Curated annotation (Swiss-Prot):
Example GO biological process: pyrroloquinoline quinone biosynthetic process
Pathway: Cofactor biosynthesis; pyrroloquinoline quinone biosynthesis
Cited Gene3D superfamilies: Coenzyme PQQ synthesis protein D (PqqD)
Protein encoded by which gene: pqqD
GO molecular function, one term: quinone binding
Pfam families assigned to the protein according to its UniProt record, in alphabetical order: PqqD
Family assignment from sequence similarity: Belongs to the PqqD family.
Protein name in the entry: PqqA binding protein
Subunit structure: Monomer. Interacts with PqqE.
Keywords: PQQ biosynthesis
Organism: Xanthomonas campestris pv. campestris (strain B100)
Cited function: Functions as a PqqA binding protein and presents PqqA to PqqE, in the pyrroloquinoline quinone (PQQ) biosynthetic pathway.
Amino acid sequence: MSTISRDSCPALRAGVRLQHDRARDQWVLLAPERVVELDDIALVVAQRYDGTQSLAEIAQTLATEFDADASEIETDVIELTTTLHQKRLLRL
């Protein structure tokens, strides 16, 4: 499995999609035979997984957008990305 760093540019794997689940009234990552519920923070990060933006760029954008500490945001973004990658939902 690839090592995730601030320079990684993740994207959703083939067959995984970001979708609003009306039954749950929640955003989810929908993968074959499984659903991963996303909280509000995970959603704004997952919406930026396009394969072109690095995690550092995503974190900086979010830090600016939410007027938050960039290093804290970057740590959280890397942690979330690592979790989703371990669940085989992302490609790097």
